[in-house]
Amino acid sequence: MTKIMFFGTRDYEKEMALNWGKKNNVEVTTSKELLSSATVDQLKDYDGVTTMQFGKLEDDVYPKLESYGIKQIAQRTAGFDMYDLDLAKKHNIVISNVPSYSPETIAEYSVSIALQLVRRFPDIERRVQAHDFTWQAEIMSKPVKNMTVAIIGTGRIGAATAKIYAGFGATITAYDAYPNKDLDFLTYKDSVKEAIKDADIISLHVPANKESYHLFDKAMFDHVKKGAILVNAARGAVINTPDLIAAVNDGTLLGAAIDTYENEAAYFTNDWTNKDIDDKTLLELIEHERILVTPHIAFFSDEAVQNLVEGGLNAALSVINTSTCETRLN
């Protein structure tokens, strides 16, 4: 019987993975550990592997997999910047991802957390906790229908986000290297700077690559409309975090919401209760009154989890049986 290791298992995924195995006549072994130099030897008797990595995979894992006859790694996220695709190819390892698992879930997160900042919820909550129930100009908002929203990246998630904002009646500008002609309710601009210059809300939905690395830094924030709101449910490396904090502090941004952080791997998805966080930048984000931080959880719905579990396992089995899969990356 074909054997697949399901690394990075969370409690709510285990039953889904085992049920998939029964339906597909595959022996699925679940493990809470991640694929790494320390765990790769567990795969000696396996045919395939799926995992959910957040940090960079060590280089020595690829030749080890090749020596064990394993032909693939099925990543259970859309992001894949934790893999060296060229090195994997050199060792005959097919890397795959799950490019679409519930774009609407992430879009709903992006809009809902932006609305918290639009309606000044963090400020209102602090005032209420201090028993200040007065109405002040500082907590007055304006309707989204009177706002301009910039969508940076109009793939599946960006497009779904744009459609929600269109339902509010917002004016929508966008930038994407490959414009989507079906999104006739928005206006594409020739550059990111042009797209954001009049935006009240900026919503980021771009992959992590050389072009997007620190795309939003001080130079980009200099082109932002004063008092704008920034939401990042894309990849942490898209933002230069110290520059983001500075932009909020000096009033360039009214506030920001980030679901991803460039150096999140050591912390996000882990329970850090009663432990010291050594990352001073992360602490500054968490403690900032006008920055909302969530732990890479924008995708987290029952539909998305089911699709990620099955997407990873389906890709692994496809490569085992046919040497390729629809979602291969290299």
Swiss-Prot record:
It catalyses: (R)-lactate + NAD(+) = pyruvate + NADH + H(+). The keyword Transmembrane helix does not apply. NAD(+) binds at residues 156-157, 176, 206-207, 233-235, 259. The keyword Amino-acid biosynthesis does not apply. It comes from the Bacteria. CDD domains: LDH (cd12186). One of its GO terms (molecular function) is NAD binding. Pfam families: 2-Hacid_dh, 2-Hacid_dh_C. PROSITE patterns: D_2_HYDROXYACID_DH_1 (PS00065), D_2_HYDROXYACID_DH_2 (PS00670), D_2_HYDROXYACID_DH_3 (PS00671). Its EC number is 1.1.1.28. This is D-lactate dehydrogenase. It comes from Staphylococcus aureus (strain MSSA476). The lineage of its organism: Bacteria, Bacillati, Bacillota, Bacilli, Bacillales. The gene is ldhD.
